[in-house]
From Swiss-Prot:
It is an enzyme of class 6 (ligase). A motif ('KMSKS' region) lies at residues 268-272. One of its GO terms (molecular function) is glutamine-tRNA ligase activity. This is Glutamine--tRNA ligase. It is found in: Cytoplasm. One of its GO terms (biological process) is glutaminyl-tRNA aminoacylation. L-glutamine binds at D67, Y212. InterPro entries: aa-tRNA-synth_I_CS, Gln-tRNA-synth, Gln/Glu-tRNA_Ligase, Gln_tRNA_ligase_bac, Glu/Gln-tRNA-synth, Glu/Gln-tRNA-synth_Ib_cat-dom, Glu/Gln-tRNA-synth_Ib_codon-bd, Glu_tRNA_lig_a-bdl. Its EC number is 6.1.1.18. The keyword Transmembrane helix does not apply. ATP binds at residues 35-37, 41-47, 231, 261-262, 269-271. The lineage of its organism: Bacteria, Pseudomonadati, Pseudomonadota, Gammaproteobacteria, Vibrionales.
């Protein structure tokens, strides 16, 4: 397969291919420009994979630029978490990290240029009045009474804004475009506002801050961005993007292209709604494994390669659509099935005693870490007289379809012997407390000598050598596919989205590294929690089941 065939094709790449073929550009330069006012989520991952992926495939560059023009909502914690997430996803930015605040001096100069050209003015309408004067989709706006101030007056007033002589909301700088435009974004948009807030990069140097639409296009141009790629909600803003660059003296004029944002079933990605989940303690934090944040997915056990594959599979289009959550689960399931070592864990234990196995004896069995990858090696698993098995793997009576342990019948223990359930003990409530079995010592790694068929295989953990563990069984956070459309999305939270159970794991898992994925045989894919797990108190998060657990729910 050629390099071109290996690349995922989409309309943006077709534009880039044409630009390069026509000689419009000789190289490709993209950027990923998050605002450092929150944690990145799976929707941002789509943009990261697109922008950094394009730069990689075309041997170009991609900048990481923080759009830090709103100091009241931004801080260094978000800056560091975003850098960590981008790196974790497998990407590296070109050169140093960029900040829009790096260009505050330049932006101020460009604002003065617009004033000097009669294309910007200082307005003293209140924010409420500005909204009122803006008009509606069906009615044009009306001019501010301050719109026709002279250039000299506007320059003097803008300098006073910078000097801190206006209170917040008392004055702003607006572009002079067209109050009757059919695009509301072009009705004299605000370019600068007064904010007496300390900035995490520039300190208290500034008390006026540029708006996103003024900053974004100029930052792109100053960095030499060739293709400015953003989501569809900025489609109308492209007119303002071009207007600003057309009316200032700047050598580079990037072009903006829009694609559809990611909409994923059974989750929300609105920053406001995610913040509500955290502040109302409906989840444990931004890195709760049920959250769609990169940090939450990482803690749950999602791998960078699975997220990149998901972004590749869903593609890049201009059409808004809802992606099935199972598509994301399929990517991590495929990844871990291929790469995760196997281990055994019992989540709902009942004791099994092999009466003809010598008490106090520990037999060390050797089990493969992966059934199809001998290069992943083996592990030693202790086998003892007393074991734990899953409660659901035993029945007193069952039909022929039940391929697990039944009273009076045989089953094979994974990687070990054939056993037969001989009798049981129950407590006063009728619950089975112990299953007493016999084992066939001639069946380790081979079938019974007399040719009898034993079809079922169940997993187990030594009761004497196994290690206690907590298992956090995560499911989708919401019960409806589109919780964001509900009147109160919080009422659609799935009460079964987290169930905690206590069980046992084989001893090799004591040293399990946080976030490293395992297949717990027959139970699903799990990883040690990166906050709460320790060798002294193991905590495993279920990343995803062996199959889609919601299929049955949907069918019902």
């Amino acid at each position: 397969m050629s390099e071109a065939e290996a690349r995922p094709s989409n309309f943006i790449r077709q534009i880039i291919d044409k630009d390069l073929a026509d000689g419009k550009h000789t190289t490709v330069h993209t950027r990923f420009p998050p605002e450092p006012n929150g944690y990145l989520h799976i929707g941002h991952a789509k943009s990261i994979c697109l922008n950094f992926g394009i730069a990689q495939d075309y041997q170009g560059q991609c900048n990481l630029r923080f759009d830090d023009t709103n100091p009241e909502k931004e801080n260094l914690e978000y800056v560091e978490s975003i850098k960590k997430d981008v790196t974790w996803l497998g990407f590296d930015w070109s050169g140093e990290v960029c900040y829009s605040s790096d260009y505050f001096d330049k932006l101020y100069e460009y604002a003065i240029e617009l004033i000097q050209k009669g294309l910007a003015y200082v307005d003293e309408l209140t924010p409420e009045q500005i909204r009122e004067y803006r008009g509606t989709l069906t009615e044009p706006g009306k001019h501010s009474p301050y719109r026709d101030r002279s250039v000299e007056e506007n320059l003097a007033l803008f300098e006073k804004m910078r000097a801190g002589e206006f209170a917040e909301g008392q004055a702003c700088l607006r572009a002079k475009i067209d109050m009757a435009s059919s695009f509301i974004v072009m009705r004299d948009p605000v370019l600068y506002r007064v904010r007496f807030a300390e900035h995490h990069q520039t300190g208290d140097k500034w008390c006026i801050y540029p708006m996103y639409d003024f900053t974004h296009c100029i930052s792109d141009a100053l960095e030499g961005i060739t293709h400015s790629i953003c989501t569809l909600e900025f489609q109308d803003n492209r007119r303002l993007y071009d207007w600003v660059l057309d009316n200032i003296t700047i050598p580079c004029h990037p072009r903006q292209y829009e694609f559809s944002r990611l909409n994923l079933e059974y989750t929300v990605m609105s920053k406001r709604k995610l913040n509500q989940l955290v502040t109302e303690k409906l989840v444990t934090g931004w890195d709760d494994p049920r959250m769609p944040t990169i940090s939450g997915l990482r803690r749950r056990g999602f791998t960078p390669s699975a997220i990149r594959e998901f972004c590749k599979r869903i593609g890049v289009t201009k059409q808004e659509n809802m992606i099935e959550y199972s598509a994301l689960e399929s990517c991590i399931r495929d990844d871990l099935n291929e790469n995760a070592p196997r281990a055994m864990a019992v989540l709902d234990p009942v004791k099994l005693v092999i009466e003809n196995f010598a008490a106090g004896t520990v037999e060390t069995l050797t089990l493969a870490n992966h059934p199809n990858k001998p290069e992943m090696g083996d592990r030693e698993v202790p086998f003892t007289r007393e074991l734990w098995i899953e409660r659901e793997d035993f029945r007193e009576e069952a039909n022929k379809k039940y391929k697990r342990l039944v009273l009076g019948k045989e089953v094979r223990l994974r990687g070990a012997y054939v056993i037969k359930a001989e009798r049981i003990e129950k407590d006063e409530q009728g619950n089975i407390t112990t299953i007493f079995c016999s084992y066939d010592p001639e069946t380790l790694g081979k079938n019974p000598a007399d040719g009898r068929k034993v079809k079922g295989v169940i997993h187990w953990v030594s009761a004497e050598k196994g290690v206690p563990a907590e298992f956090r069984l995560y499911e989708r956070l919401f019960t409806v596919p589109n919780p964001g459309a509900a009147d109160n999305f919080a009422e659609t939270i799935n009460p079964e989205s987290l169930v905690k159970v206590q069980g046992y794991v084989e001893p090799s898992l004591v040293e399990a590294k946080p976030e490293f994925g395992y297949q717990f045989e027959r139970m699903g894919y799990f990883c040690a929690d990166n906050k709460d797990s320790s060798p002294q108190a193991l905590v495993f998060n279920r990343t995803v089941g062996l199959r889609d657990s919601f299929v049955k729910i949907d069918e019902e």
